[in-house]
UniProtKB/Swiss-Prot annotation:
It comes from Thalassiosira pseudonana (Marine diatom). This is Small ribosomal subunit protein uS13c. Located at the top of the head of the 30S subunit, it contacts several helices of the 16S rRNA. Keywords: Chloroplast, Plastid, Ribonucleoprotein, Ribosomal protein, RNA-binding, rRNA-binding. The keyword Ribosomal protein applies.
Length: 123
């Protein structure tokens, strides 16, 4: 099992797709890291040698990207700042509503949560 930046990568996936389990790395940047580490794109996570894992770990730790914990902290602080200055986006985050102008009369279920049923009024 390969462990990078505190994340256990899935065992039987191709290494490019396994790297996307690290917060902040998408498929494109994963492919660039693999190319820099001189690892074949068809290599599975189980087939990575310890030397290749060390090279990959060094590349990820020394890159200029914010990854994993730093990125989560950065995003959390940005949302906290929006809440503190009481702007529209901060209010939307606080109320668990869509932030980027999407409609809420219908849809937005994943952001707002499951429907809350209201009992009908008896006559």
């Amino acid at each position: 099992m390969v462990r990078l930046l505190g994340i256990d990568l899935p065992r039987n996936k191709r290494i490019a797709y396994a790297l996307t389990y690290i917060h902040g790395i998408g498929l494109t940047s994963a492919q660039k890291f693999i190319e820099l580490a001189e690892i074949s794109a068809d290599t599975r996570t189980d087939d990575i040698t310890t030397e290749q894992a060390v090279v990959l770990r060094n590349l990820l730790e020394n890159c200029e990207l914010n990854l994993e914990g730093d990125l989560r902290r950065f995003n959390g602080l940005n949302i906290k700042r929006l809440n503190e200055i009481n702007c529209h986006r901060g209010k939307r985050h606080r109320n668990s509503l869509p932030v980027r102008g999407q409609r809420t009369r219908t849809n937005a279920r994943s952001r707002r949560g499951a429907k809350k049923t209201v009992t009908g009024k008896k006559k």
